[in-house]
Amino acid sequence: LPTPLALPLRDYQQETHPVLKLWAACDAVEILLRVLVFLGIGDLSRRGELPEQLRRELRYPIENPMLGNWRRMAQQVAEALPEDTALPELSPLVRDNLVPFLDGPKRRSSVDRSFLALRNRLAHGGGISRRLAAELLANWQPPFEALWPRMTWLADWAFVIRTDGGYGRLRGPRPTLEPCGLTTPEPLTAAFSSVDGVVALHGDQLIPLWPLTL
């Protein structure tokens, strides 16, 4: 997977304390939502300015980037993607997997059914005991880990940055860049007009991901 996703997953896998492991799961889900939002916005932006309604819908949550708002933005962006999107997997992933995982059953927003409720309990519940954390982890570990095999399509996208020596690929949890031998046609050159830019590449598809540098 691209490094922005692989790193929090590695932290989750290596963590042994149940409270910290729950937090690591929350971090991984939030970063996944961010990546999906930025990919979707990038794909839409390639076609011109974002639709005005979508711009209005995103204005508040993008200025208040909490997990619940990232979930809302992911759904809004997914619903705005056209049929010929370069990301055909994104909308069904958000609709069929992430939204049910985060929201849980309607009218049953409890910490054992809604991942958003779990995140809010961790953040605002005044702390939890190790015993309770272990119980919650036993409940959430299977559905959390079942999400990630559905992300394999993201591994097909190369997350590329420009370096002094050319280009490097952000892949896996390693701190170093992989070599990325790319030619530089005009669209690629334009996408890297910012030194800190990040570009997602898949075949002849190119999506600028500048928000990942924030």
Question: Can you say where each PLM-predicted feature lies in the sequence?
Answer:
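Amphipathic, oligomerization/interface secondary-structure segments
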Residues: 3-121
